[in-house]
Amino acid sequence: MEDFVRQCFNPMIVELAEKAMKEYGEDLKIETNKFAAICTHLEVCFMYSDFHFINEQGESIVVELDDPNALLKHRFEIIEGRDRTMAWTVVNSICNTTGAEKPKFLPDLYDYKENRFIEIGVTRREVHIYYLEKANKIKSENTHIHIFSFTGEEMATKADYTLDEESRARIKTRLFTIRQEMANRGLWDSFRQSERGEETIEERFEITGTMRRLADQSLPPNFSCLENFRAYVDGFEPNGCIEGKLSQMSKEVNARIEPFLKTTPRPIRLPDGPPCFQRSKFLLMDALKLSIEDPSHEGEGIPLYDAIKCMRTFFGWKEPYIVKPHEKGINPNYLLSWKQVLAELQDIENEEKIPRTKNMKKTSQLKWALGENMAPEKVDFDNCRDISDLKQYDSDEPELRSLSSWIQNEFNKACELTDSIWIELDEIGEDVAPIEYIASMRRNYFTAEVSHCRATEYIMKGVYINTALLNASCAAMDDFQLIPMISKCRTKEGRRKTNLYGFIIKGRSHLRNDTDVVNFVSMEFSLTDPRLEPHKWEKYCVLEIGDMLLRSAIGQMSRPMFLYVRTNGTSKIKMKWGMEMRRCLLQSLQQIESMIEAESSVKEKDMTKEFFENKSETWPIGESPKGVEEGSIGKVCRTLLAKSVFNSLYASPQLEGFSAESRKLLLVVQALRDNLEPGTFDLGGLYEAIEECLINDPWVLLNASWFNSFLTHALR
């Protein structure tokens, strides 16, 4: 950090900062973040003053430095950066000549035009928090406060920003540049977190020792110590604090706080249109597995060997044909692609030794399906600056889609138990430290509830597919590699099992940036007839490829076997998150843990054992049109896990927006249920922000429908 400061700031500023730290007995080799903060503050004070003069008529003017008029009177007197004695001498002199009231603390500047002292603040936290700390410390009407943040926000007394917009923009740009430079060197996080609040020196009852440490530990985020939190709370007017805050932000804002009553909220409007379609990267409830138990074949664990072994377990293959075409695709190409996979797998089996990986021949059907040579040619921007009508592609607005019942069915299925164990105990991670016995017990109970869950199967399937695809994308960039979609599990009896869901063929994958896309064709086995819900399969071409004999209570029966084929794409960053889907287990475990903690604090003893072993007790799971659904603690665990998994599988900007905006409405409704008499302003704007996210995503539409059920029952 010290090297960065010396490179980034003017030597004069660095020298002044060194003097200031020496004056306060601080070591800049140790307090490097403070060194950077002092330099930043000095530079902002100097930039605030630069180019601002007062002419003979007493008007404020902005003049560049090399202008001959620079002999005009400077508008600002700089106090910051002087040693304490000299600074107080300047302040006293100003007070004597202008009649200004002497401030309690040394300000940063004096404004000769407005006749007031100015306190400049530069914060890495929220501007309003820092503003209130400053105001509480100064406790003076006569010192004007102006706060800047590294994110481009600012706040000033009575929203009077003193300088013209261009001068302030210069300061904000410089702060943003400093932040970027720090981030590039990996220094920003440490710098951001090191900011302490304003220290106020007042005589008050002292809290010391253990109580003091406990007080400091139990503060809300963004507060470094009890004093800062006190200052923040003291700065709030009990009445009208929202209006006050808004008026500080802008003179134009005039918000009327409306009471939020049971009759106030309306349901969220879901879009009309054709039903939404399946958009996950792989099939969920409709997937079919070809499996081998206790695999012990040669090359066991090598995906291609495992896949061929699984394919050999099925004998009902037949000449494939299309049963549900893709509306916009060249469907024969999908059919030819599957035939090519079968033929090339047959070729491998005829070889003496099976290779570890298989690169497909670059046939016309695969080139079409993988979008080979379809991307528009990239041209350097500098080469087309002179083109007068240069513009971005016209892109159509996405078509609005309505909620369809299949997504609720998918979710219900994800919460169900399967007859296999998908995670071992150590999937959540061993205890790193000698952690309490309680934590291990909770983890073991939770794992027992979710290890058989279908959502856990989706996690392991997602981790495998994304890992295999990312590896292939890096190792075989130019090849059309065949990637089997595999998962591993154990039967109830503990026997190992390898499952094949189908295949992926990846396209060219020169992935330089995190968001660069690799195309792939997925081919997945299923027993679901696509003609039952054709809208769900809009993006797929579905083939019938065989007949499967199934054992049932009434004997054997034959069912047609389908292959769901589609072109898809993903990116490095999406695959990276897909590989980390196990985090969903951790997230849902933490949610369960907070429920146990709440119960334990009421009973004043650890309730983990009772929580999981009392099978008669039911817990709220979620809302449905019928009301609050309840179930066993195991069902709660599996539902929370399924929600977390679906958030990962259906991650999208629509989901991000809906979650963030609907949460605001949820908090207001919760406040109403807790009889806190909440008030709102611009509720219509909040609804608009929520409904803007409801376009065509099935998971977002389902969440919006659940939210409406919650509103109905919460406000009865």
UniProtKB/Swiss-Prot annotation:
Annotated positions binding Mn(2+) 2: E80, D108
What's the protein here called? Answer: Polymerase acidic protein
Q: How is the cofactor bound?
A: Binds 2 manganese ions per subunit.
Can you tell which superkingdom this protein's organism belongs to? Viruses
Any one GO MF term held by the record is: endonuclease activity
Write out the residue ranges of the motif Nuclear localization signal 2 (NLS2).
Answer: 184-247
Which cofactor is essential here? Mn(2+)
One GO cellular component from the entry? host cell nucleus
Q: What does this protein do?
A: Plays an essential role in viral RNA transcription and replication by forming the heterotrimeric polymerase complex together with PB1 and PB2 subunits. The complex transcribes viral mRNAs by using a unique mechanism called cap-snatching. It consists in the hijacking and cleavage of host capped pre-mRNAs. These short capped RNAs are then used as primers for viral mRNAs. The PB2 subunit is responsible for the binding of the 5' cap of cellular pre-mRNAs which are subsequently cleaved after 10-13 nucleotides by the PA subunit that carries the endonuclease activity.
For this protein's source organism, the top of the classification is: Viruses, Riboviria, Orthornavirae, Negarnaviricota, Polyploviricotina
Entry's InterPro entries?
Answer: INFV_PA (IPR037534), PA/PA-X (IPR001009), PA/PA-X_sf (IPR038372)
Its source organism is Influenza A virus (strain A/Qu/7/1970 H3N2)
Localization recorded for this chain is: Host cytoplasm; Host nucleus
